[in-house]
Curated annotation (Swiss-Prot):
NCBIfam families to which the protein is assigned, alphabetical: DapD_Ac (TIGR03532)
EC number: 2.3.1.89
Gene name of this polypeptide: dapH
Name the UniProt record assigns to this protein: 2,3,4,5-tetrahydropyridine-2,6-dicarboxylate N-acetyltransferase
Keywords: Acyltransferase, Amino-acid biosynthesis, Diaminopimelate biosynthesis, Lysine biosynthesis, Repeat, Transferase
SUPFAM superfamilies: Trimeric LpxA-like enzymes
Task of the protein: Catalyzes the transfer of an acetyl group from acetyl-CoA to tetrahydrodipicolinate.
Pathway(s) served: Amino-acid biosynthesis; L-lysine biosynthesis via DAP pathway; LL-2,6-diaminopimelate from (S)-tetrahydrodipicolinate (acetylase route): step 1/3
Catalytic activity as recorded in UniProt: (S)-2,3,4,5-tetrahydrodipicolinate + acetyl-CoA + H2O = L-2-acetamido-6-oxoheptanedioate + CoA
GO biological process: diaminopimelate biosynthetic process; lysine biosynthetic process via diaminopimelate
Protein family according to the UniProt entry: Belongs to the transferase hexapeptide repeat family. DapH subfamily.
Protein source organism: Lactobacillus acidophilus (strain ATCC 700396 / NCK56 / N2 / NCFM)
GO molecular function: tetrahydrodipicolinate N-acetyltransferase activity
């Protein structure tokens, strides 16, 4: 796991070089160009693609106007301090459209569905599913074999540095569109109903529902029948 505390994350972001990466499609007399080491180029005689930071690419384009006939720039961030993580290193199922920042830990056989947003310092345990559109804020911790329902939010805490992160223990099921505010601890095997707003810690094997969430009952066999997880969905 990342084990990043708030102070470490603040230092990481504060000291990180801020980057504006761009991809540029160019046409012209490209064989006459001298590309600096700061610009990666995949060009042929008259067309190609270059990659680099805008602070390097912009002056290069301006200095070579006579040789470059046409160009189109693609760019999706500005002065970004935290890049997206390299997904290839995880033994997990990560679907298209998930946005996962650097310094995130994802356990074996975890599932990250489309549109999930996972911020720096978050931790996801083995066999846990993060459903569509879920937001895991900075430093949010989710244990093993959990299901975080579509559209749910686990609030992040990076500032103030003294704040406690959300902690979800193993075997927890959270229904769609629930919100767990910062600093909340949800105990092992608990169930949070869809749409609940959790403002207090939840005891293990307890079901809560409502706004704000209140204890409904202890998790029983009937609850488990309705909230059981399917291990086949977690196979890689």
């Amino acid at each position: 796991m990342t084990n990043l505390d708030a102070k470490s994350i603040i230092e990481y972001i504060g000291n990180a070089p801020k980057k504006t990466p761009v991809k540029v499609f160019i046409k012209g007399n490209l064989d006459q160009l001298n590309f600096p080491n700061t610009i990666e180029n995949f060009t042929e005689q008259h067309s190609g693609i270059i990659f680099g930071d805008w602070k390097d690419v912009e002056p290069f384009l301006n200095d070579n106007k006579e040789k470059i006939v046409q160009y189109r720039i693609e760019n999706d961030v500005r002065n970004s301090a935290v890049p997206l993580i390299d997904l290839k290193k995880f033994n997990a199922r990560i679907e298209p459209g998930a946005i996962i920042r650097d310094q995130v830990a994802i356990g074996k056989n975890a599932v990250i569905m489309m549109g999930a947003i996972i911020n720096i310092g978050a931790e996801i345990g083995d066999d846990t599913m993060i459903d569509m559109g879920v937001v895991l804020g900075g430093r949010a911790i989710v244990g093993k074999h959990c299901h975080i329902g579509a559209g749910s939010v686990l609030a992040g805490v990076i500032e103030p540095a003294s704040a406690k992160p959300v902690q979800i223990d193993d075997d927890v099921v959270i229904g769609a569109n629930a919100v767990v505010i910062e600093g909340i601890h949800v105990g092992k095997g608990a169930v949070i109903a869809a749409g609940a707003i959790v403002t207090k810690d939840v005891e293990p094997y307890t079901m809560v529902a409502g706004v704000p969430a209140k204890v409904i009952k202890k998790v029983d066999n009937k609850t488990l029948d309705k909230t059981g997880l399917e291990d086949d969905l977690r196979k890689i």
